[in-house]
């Protein structure tokens, strides 16, 4: 039947008249649908004319609901004439809670439609969130009204009980629907005021329930009450929304990334601040989901493994100091920081110990194998030493210290107890003994120079005996006093410069102080890098010499520029003095002037030798005369010769190499007796020269023992690159952790070949694994190794390797699960680590990190023995490894910076290009796994990355990957719901996902 449309009557009025006629004539649902479509404009929703409002007004006019109108309402919903949002919003306005029959009818209607709630248009999406909040609030009001009635009458009528039961059923359906919970969660951000009222109403219901003695009815077989459902909705958080976990459930039993990470930090960033370690370890904890106790245990275990690997080497003292002095400081800092960040976890602030530390030692005791091995290796009870250091930092008290130590007593009864006065050889004991001397040296260095010259000389030279200097440096480094120590030595060296007219004992003492302080400073710079220990802007003699004349790795310096800086008149005078019988004793040049002009001297001597103006014997005598006066002269000469050897041909290397070798030959006993502490100074001189030889001479080191003794990172090797890597990786697989020598070799490969080559080789090792356990283990080790230069390696992985794998340019098999999942996890770990990497001066530098002077030099001569690699193996990023500022609060997401931001944008655009068909391929599933792991592992920290995802990527992926892996929790975690655009995109994706699910369910039916 078609109704006559009068121009003067609005369509809303027409709809109301139509409703009355439909009721009078008892239209069927089909008749109603036909006639109402004649009134509504094609393509226009009935919401525009308040159709849902009109129907519901007529449906609940009397004491009972009109089922005919409710059937019209349901038909209109099914025919998409009105939206679910409009219906829910209108129902939530009904406030006649005493009309039990109407309430029951409305609740039954809700129960029948709530499972199919969705959106069909953009306008509806914005309304549905508030409508769902209003509906939940309305249900809570009904329930509260029932409890109030019970409180007054001490009982409920049959109708009231049915209202409570129906309310519970609707709430149950809402809570059991992830889509509806997701809509409520979005509404929490869309209308915080209404959600606040909802949360407040929940508390009121809780209090009223307790006060009235009302027993909440059990809704399901799981003994869940209405109050439980209300509480779940009112306290909804991200964790409430389910997500498919690709990273596995629970915490992994064994972690393989901590030991390689600590090994890399110890070797290449020894002067790192405690807070930098704290941020790095907390980042690993968040990625792995460790509790603090597990984190502490893993740190200690990793350090003990590293210490075992370096026994008997020059690095042993530093790693020992790091383990027993630095680690307690790090744990103390983590303890304090976590108390600030998570105060609820530390309710009892009066504890004189950390329960996490106690639990960490309990976990450590379970790994008795490494403890037994280290006790025997270090000739001490390592647990007892660690406990004593923890006591100093108030991380554990006497009671628990004794309890934990007692558990090891039975095993270590044959070992000597901790006693610093015993003569038993123990590196741990020696390291701890080095703390008091360090304090004394720093105090003396800060005293009046004129009053402590002899005492200072004796103290410094005594330190040079044995390995005391390395012990002192190790302790100074881990305690953060290395810069203070260096500043004191520079001050001493500056004060010890030659004073005209000074004679006798004072002059000899001053000369020895100048020499020994210079040697010690060179040794420190050689091992710790000039950036980490020297201060910018200062102009002392030593710092000027380091900047202009000292050869350093990754800092090319032109030897000819050094020659140009020399004063030719002083060079000539120096030559005359060395040719005289008295040698340098008769020269008027000051010590510091000789050091500065040695490059010019050696250049002329080399030219004379090559032109056969001087014989080999004369050269030897010449060099012996130079080195006999001061040891620092040998260092200055060797430094220039090493720089000079970088620019000459292979057939010209022999003469400068022989000159360097002459500086390490023994001197006569008579000369040894003429100068104070010459033996100690010569010992340090030989160490410095040997390291320069290994680092800068263009010949491979044949003796592994020599490379093990010296901290060499020589790029020179006779073996092909592939063989070097395979040999290193074979050792890693055999041990299950990263040996120190392997770490150095991998750093060499990174510097030689660039990050792409190394990352490619590392990722290939994951694909060689047969079992998931092996894949995860290898992935952990690969992730840690990439911290050699985490930014550049991450960029190489994301911008080069992953796109090439997707395009199959590497001619490898298809990226399929579980390989794709492990690769995606590696990508996510690297993204988070790069974002959160602290900004510190570091020795992990790229070959591009050289001065302009070096750039000019490289145009003349390439770095010796550098392999020529194809363009595909070169790194696209040549920038220095510069990290961003350290964040004060971990809960604030680290901002994305270039080049990571641009790299991720390009990667996501690449993903969009692949999603062009409706076919689910392994490549598309890898993209989904990557995004899922981003939100699963990265959580709130990854928000800046998620903002880069192109619009439409998720919806296109949902249309293809409409599997159980796609969840509401995943979708909502992708967006920042604090922003209007984030909520809009989230609701759009949610509704599309809902409609896809409903279509699948209808097909199954």
From Swiss-Prot:
GO annotation terms (biological process): positive regulation of transcription initiation by RNA polymerase II
Signal peptide: none
InterPro entries in UniProt: Mediator_Med24 (IPR021429)
Pfam family, one: Med24_N
Chief location category: nucleus
Sample GO molecular function, one term: transcription coregulator activity
Entry annotated with the keyword Transcription: yes
The keyword Transcription is annotated on this UniProt entry: yes
Subcellular location: Nucleus
GO cellular component: mediator complex
Keywords from the named record: Activator, Nucleus, Repeat, Transcription, Transcription regulation
Family recorded in the similarity comment: Belongs to the Mediator complex subunit 24 family.
Role: Component of the Mediator complex, a coactivator involved in the regulated transcription of nearly all RNA polymerase II-dependent genes. Mediator functions as a bridge to convey information from gene-specific regulatory proteins to the basal RNA polymerase II transcription machinery. Mediator is recruited to promoters by direct interactions with regulatory proteins and serves as a scaffold for the assembly of a functional preinitiation complex with RNA polymerase II and the general transcription factors.
The protein's assembly and partners: Component of the Mediator complex.
Name of this protein: Mediator of RNA polymerase II transcription subunit 24
Origin species: Aedes aegypti (Yellowfever mosquito)
Gene transcribed to yield this protein: MED24
């Amino acid at each position: 039947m078609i109704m006559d449309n009068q121009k003067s009557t609005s369509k809303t009025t027409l709809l109301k008249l139509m409703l009355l006629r439909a009721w009078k004539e008892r239209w069927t649902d089909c008749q109603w649908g036909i006639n109402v479509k004649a009134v509504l404009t094609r393509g226009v929703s009935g919401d525009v004319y308040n159709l849902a409002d009109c129907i519901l007004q007529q449906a609940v006019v009397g004491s009972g609901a009109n089922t005919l109108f409710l059937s019209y309402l349901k038909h209109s919903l099914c025919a998409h004439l009105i939206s679910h949002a409009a219906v829910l919003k209108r129902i939530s306005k009904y406030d006649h809670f005493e009309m039990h029959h109407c309430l029951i009818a409305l609740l039954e209607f809700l129960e029948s439609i709530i499972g199919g709630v969705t959106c069909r248009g953009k306008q509806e999406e914005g309304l549905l969130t508030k409508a769902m909040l209003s509906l939940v609030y309305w249900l809570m009001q009904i329930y509260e009204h029932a409890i109030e009635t019970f409180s007054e009458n001490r009982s409920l009528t049959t109708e009231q009980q049915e209202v409570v039961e129906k309310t519970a059923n609707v709430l149950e359906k809402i809570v059991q629907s992830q889509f509806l919970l997701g809509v409520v969660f979005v509404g929490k951000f869309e209308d915080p005021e209404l959600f606040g009222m909802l949360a407040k109403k929940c508390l009121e219901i809780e209090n009223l329930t307790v006060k009235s003695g009302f027993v909440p009815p059990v809704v399901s077989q799981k003994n869940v009450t209405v109050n439980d459902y209300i509480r779940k909705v009112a306290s909804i958080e991200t964790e409430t929304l389910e997500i498919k976990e690709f990273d596995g459930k629970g915490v992994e039993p064994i972690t393989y990334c901590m030991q390689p990470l600590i090994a890399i930090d110890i070797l290449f960033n020894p002067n790192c601040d405690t807070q930098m370690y704290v941020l790095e370890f907390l980042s690993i904890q968040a990625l792995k989901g460790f509790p603090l106790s597990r984190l502490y245990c893993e740190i200690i275990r990793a350090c003990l493994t590293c210490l075992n690997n370096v026994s008997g080497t020059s690095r042993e003292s530093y790693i020992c100091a790091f383990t027993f002095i630095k680690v307690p400081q790090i744990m103390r800092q983590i303890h304090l920081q976590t108390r600030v960040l998570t105060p609820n976890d530390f309710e009892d602030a009066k504890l004189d110990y950390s329960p996490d530390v106690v639990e960490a030692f309990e976990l450590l005791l379970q790994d008795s194998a490494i403890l037994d091995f280290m006790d025997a290796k270090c000739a001490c009870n390592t647990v007892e030493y660690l406990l004593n250091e923890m006591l100093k930092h108030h991380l554990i008290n006497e009671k628990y210290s004794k309890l934990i130590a007692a558990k090891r007593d039975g095993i270590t009864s044959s070992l000597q107890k901790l006693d610093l006065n015993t003569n038993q050889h123990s590196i741990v004991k020696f390291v701890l003994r080095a703390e008091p001397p360090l304090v004394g040296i720093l105090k003396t260095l800060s005293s009046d120079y004129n009053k402590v010259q002899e005492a200072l000389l004796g103290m410094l030279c005594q330190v040079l005996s044995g390995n005391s200097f390395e012990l002192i440096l190790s302790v100074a480094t881990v305690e953060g006093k290395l810069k203070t120590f260096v500043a004191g030595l520079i001050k001493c060296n500056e004060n010890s410069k030659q004073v005209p007219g000074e004679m006798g004992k004072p002059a000899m003492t001053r000369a020895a102080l100048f020499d020994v302080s210079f040697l010690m400073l060179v040794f420190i710079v050689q091992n710790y890098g000039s950036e980490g220990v020297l201060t910018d802007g200062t102009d002392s003699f030593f710092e000027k010499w380091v900047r202009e004349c000292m050869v350093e790795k990754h800092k090319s310096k032109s030897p000819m520029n050094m020659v140009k800086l020399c004063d030719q008149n002083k060079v000539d005078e120096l030559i005359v003095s060395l040719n005289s019988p008295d040698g340098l004793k008769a020269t008027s040049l000051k010590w510091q002037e000789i050091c500065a002009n040695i490059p010019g001297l050696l250049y002329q001597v080399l030219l004379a030798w090559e032109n056969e103006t001087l014989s080999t014997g004369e050269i030897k005598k010449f060099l012996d005369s130079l080195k006999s006066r001061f040891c620092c002269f040998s260092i200055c000469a060797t430094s220039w010769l090493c720089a000079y050897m970088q620019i000459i041909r292979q057939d010209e290397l022999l003469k400068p190499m022989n000159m360097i070798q002459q500086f390490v030959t023994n001197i006569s006993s008579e000369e040894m007796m003429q100068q104070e502490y010459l033996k100690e100074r010569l010992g340090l001189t030989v160490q410095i020269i040997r390291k320069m030889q290994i680092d800068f001479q263009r010949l491979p080191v044949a003796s592994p023992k020599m490379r093990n003794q010296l901290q060499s990172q020589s790029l020179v090797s006779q073996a092909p690159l592939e063989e070097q890597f395979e040999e290193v990786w074979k050792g890693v697989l055999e041990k299950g952790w990263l040996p120190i020598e392997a770490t150095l070799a991998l750093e060499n490969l990174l510097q030689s070949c660039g990050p792409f080559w190394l990352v490619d080789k590392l990722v290939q090792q994951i694909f060689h694994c047969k079992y998931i356990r092996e894949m995860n283990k290898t992935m952990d080790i690969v992730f840690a190794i990439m911290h050699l230069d985490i930014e550049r390696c991450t960029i190489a992985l994301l911008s080069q390797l992953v796109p090439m794998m997707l395009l199959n340019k590497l001619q490898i098999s298809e990226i399929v699960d579980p390989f794709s999942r492990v690769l995606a996890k590696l990508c996510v770990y690297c993204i988070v680590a790069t974002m959160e990497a602290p900004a510190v001066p570091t020795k992990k530098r790229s070959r591009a990190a050289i001065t302009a002077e070096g750039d000019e030099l490289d145009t003349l001569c390439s770095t010796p023995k550098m392999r020529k690699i194809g363009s595909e193996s070169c790194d696209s990023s040549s920038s220095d490894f510069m990290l961003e500022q350290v964040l004060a609060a971990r809960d604030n997401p680290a901002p994305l910076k270039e080049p990571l931001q641009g790299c991720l944008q390009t990667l996501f655009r690449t993903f969009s290009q692949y999603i062009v068909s409706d076919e689910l391929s392994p490549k598309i599933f890898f993209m989904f796994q990557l995004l899922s792991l981003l939100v699963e592992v990265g959580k709130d920290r990854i928000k800046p990355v998620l903002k880069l995802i192109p619009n439409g990527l998720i919806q296109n992926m949902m249309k293809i990957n409409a599997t159980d892996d796609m969840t509401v929790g995943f979708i909502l975690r992708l967006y920042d719901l604090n922003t209007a655009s984030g909520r809009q995109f989230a609701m759009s994706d949610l509704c599309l996902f809902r409609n896809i699910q409903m279509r699948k369910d209808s097909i199954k039916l």
